[in-house]
């Protein structure tokens, strides 16, 4: 799906200046099954009208790390991945900036690890040696499992993780192919559908492990933001505005998501389980969203101490992020 708006004038609601020779800019991205990113919602709401910005869906992301590979390779302008995956990619040499939180975890939106009702698994300690279905390796759910085990004094690699696409998480759990299915905070549509069928029990969630924090980020290449500073600012401000819209108008957001999913040929029914994006009001990150994972990666020896600096990674539209 390509969403195009003519370059007439900047959206007045954003309060942004318009240069006399406003060039049209195409922003390519990979979509995720079962939901919309905030920039997709922003486009549906008309927040890019008159900005000269075109956002173009060029396919589906097979997990956050694959999205970052596409971003690094130049086949998209926007990536999206769990914070730890973003930091690993930056540490490996990719000059990315974290534009805005794609989702977050709080009491309303969280990743939950489910078992069947009759499962003997009842705590983090019980997941040792068990098989857990996650959407991808090296991303949010992977690191949540590692951190949960670490906090209990257990080896971080003592559970077996297997990759299962979101639409199949319920199926593999009910069929006994895995012991646990982890439904990510961005997969609340699939979670709701699974719970509707009954017979599942939550063991733990990522807020138990991490507290309230951004779960992942929409990511831009730094060179692109320098070449297109106005467009980068518009993109972020329109997207964070859409995050607030979803918070304030959840039912309308569900209607939009359902319509777009139907247009994509996906199951529109799951949109009714959309629980929000789980981010703070205003959609802006705080440094802890990044620093928490920097500390984890340094502790694990994945990155050298001091290699990553949270403030340098966070993209700024002029509003400095808070520090806590």
Model-derived features: positions:
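Bacterial N-terminal signal peptides
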Residues: 7-17
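Short, solvent-exposed loop/beta-turn-alpha elements that line the ligand-binding surface or hinge
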Residues: 50, 103-106, 208-211, 278-287
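Short, glycine-/small- and polar/acidic-enriched structural segments
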Residues: 24-155, 162-163, 179-185, 212
């Amino acid at each position: 799906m390509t969403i195009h708006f003519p370059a007439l004038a900047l959206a007045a609601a954003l309060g942004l200046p318009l240069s006399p020779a406003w060039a049209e800019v195409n922003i390519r991205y990979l979509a995720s099954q079962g939901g919309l990113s905030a920039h997709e919602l922003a486009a549906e709401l008309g927040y890019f009208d008159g900005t000269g910005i075109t956002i173009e869906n060029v396919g589906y992301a097979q997990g956050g790390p694959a999205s970052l590979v596409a971003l690094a390779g130049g086949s998209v302008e926007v990536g999206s991945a769990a914070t730890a995956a973003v930091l690993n990619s930056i540490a490996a040499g990719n000059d990315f900036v974290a534009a805005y939180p794609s989702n977050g975890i709080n009491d309303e939106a969280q990743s939950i690890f489910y078992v069947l009702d009759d499962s003997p698994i009842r705590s983090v300690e019980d997941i040792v040696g068990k098989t857990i279905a996650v959407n991808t390796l090296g991303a949010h759910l992977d690191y949540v499992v590692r951190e949960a085990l670490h906090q209990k004094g257990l080896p971080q690699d003592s559970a077996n993780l297997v990759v299962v696409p979101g639409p199949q998480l319920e199926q593999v759990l009910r069929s006994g192919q895995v012991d646990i299915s982890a439904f990510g905070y961005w997969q609340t549509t699939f979670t709701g559908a699974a719970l509707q069928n009954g017979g599942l029990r939550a063991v733990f969630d990522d807020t138990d492990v991490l507290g309230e924090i951004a779960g992942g980020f929409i990511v831009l290449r730094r060179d692109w933001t320098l070449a297109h500073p106005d467009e980068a600012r518009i993109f972020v401000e329109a997207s964070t505005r859409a995050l607030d819209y979803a918070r304030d108008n959840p039912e309308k957001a569900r209607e939009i998501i359902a319509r777009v999913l139907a247009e994509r040929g996906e199951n529109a029914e799951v949109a009714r389980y959309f629980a929000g994006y789980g981010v703070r009001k205003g959609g802006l990150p705080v440094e802890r969203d990044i620093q928490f994972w920097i500390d984890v990666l340094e502790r694990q020896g994945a990155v050298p101490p001091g290699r990553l600096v949270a403030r340098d990674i966070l993209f700024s539209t002029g509003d400095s992020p808070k520090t806590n």
